[in-house]
UniProtKB/Swiss-Prot annotation:
Pfam families: Coq4. Component of a multi-subunit COQ enzyme complex, composed of at least COQ3, COQ4, COQ5, COQ6, COQ7 and COQ9. Its EC number is 4.1.1.130. It is found in: Mitochondrion inner membrane. HAMAP family: Coq4. It comes from Phaeosphaeria nodorum (strain SN15 / ATCC MYA-4574 / FGSC 10173). This is Ubiquinone biosynthesis protein COQ4, mitochondrial. Pathway: Cofactor biosynthesis; ubiquinone biosynthesis. It comes from the Eukaryota. GO terms for biological process: ubiquinone biosynthetic process. The gene is COQ4. GO terms for cellular component: extrinsic component of mitochondrial inner membrane; mitochondrion. Residues 1-32 form a transit peptide. Residues 260-290 are annotated as: Disordered.
Length: 290
């Protein structure tokens, strides 16, 4: 005899059968999408999917290659390509160094206020602090213009990227390279050999956009200098710049194993003067021949 089934039993039976086409997620699970992002890991953090990170890397990389003056694109490309491997490796190198560990623990920030730029201008002429302040004044730049890190997922690694970014002007002052393109390419080559960050490597490729004379100087002088010194010197990310401001800059270079390259501004000036004299000589010969 068939068993009688009431309507309530049918409803219970239907509710106990899962529908194959639907995937039931745990209550705490969240889909990662542009419209439904997981919470940020720190203030200002913007999580990215793999596709978004790839798009950011390609777009900002091409843009910064075509226009190296776009600091925002350079910063975005640096963050998009630094993880998952390179920024962690740089962080690990800091953890292996006593000074690097102190920097990670203290988390200092390099700003015009924290550095007290007016005080640095009063230091003895050959100190790092004085040379740094003089370099800022000559190049017309400020330590307060560095963008805040947004796309690095790990909070500690985000600080490492921020620290690298804020230390960039100290690298300029330490080796005496200016901020125009030729100087930036040389410094980025030094940074690539020292830090291994992909963004610095891409910047080296912009050497192909240099003028003929600039390319010749980079190939003959500044490229070899950058590769040699970046590879052989101490990790510049592990320098506690705030504690070296009153250090003699020549002694600091010696301690770090960094040779100061030829003065790029003086070389460019000498080349312009030579071109001017050559032009005047040709004009004189032309007038004499007439």
């Amino acid at each position: 005899m068939a068993k009688r089934v009431c309507v309530g039993d049918l409803r219970k039976l239907a509710g106990s059968v899962s529908t194959p086409s639907r995937c039931i997620l745990p209550p705490h699970a969240r889909c990662f999408s542009v419209l439904n992002r997981p919470p940020p890991n720190y203030e200002g953090h913007i999580p990215l999917t793999v596709i978004e990170r790839l798009g950011l890397a390609v777009g900002s990389g091409l843009g910064s290659f075509l226009d190296p003056r776009r600091a925002d694109l350079i910063a975005s490309f640096g963050e998009a390509t630094a993880q998952p491997h390179f920024i962690y490796k740089l962080r690990d190198r800091m953890l292996l160094n006593p000074t690097g560990r102190r920097i990670l623990r203290d988390r200092p920030r390099l700003t015009s206020t924290s550095l007290d730029i007016p005080r640095l201008r009063q230091l003895p002429p050959n100190t790092l602090g004085y040379v740094y302040a003089l370099w800022l004044d000559r190049e017309g730049v400020s330590p307060d213009t560095r963008a805040t890190v947004q796309y690095i997922d790990d909070e500690e690694c985000a600080y490492v990227m921020q620290r690298y970014r804020e230390c960039h002007d100290f690298y300029h002052a330490l080796v005496g390279l200016p901020v125009f393109r030729e100087g930036e390419v040389a410094l980025k080559a030094f940074e690539f050999a020292n830090t291994g960050l992909p963004m610095t490597g891409l910047a080296v490729f912009s050497a192909f956009t240099l003028k003929k004379a600039e390319w010749r100087r980079f190939w003959d002088i500044y490229g070899p200098w950058a590769t040699r010194n970046g590879a052989q010197s101490d990790d510049v990310i592990n320098i506690y710049w705030e504690e070296e401001l009153e250090t003699d800059i020549d002694q600091l270079r010696t301690r770090l194993g960094i040779e100061k390259p030829p003065d790029l501004r003086e070389m460019r000036k000498a080349e312009r003067e030579a071109q001017k004299k050559d032009k005047e000589a040709k004009e004189t010969m032309t007038r004499a021949a007439v």
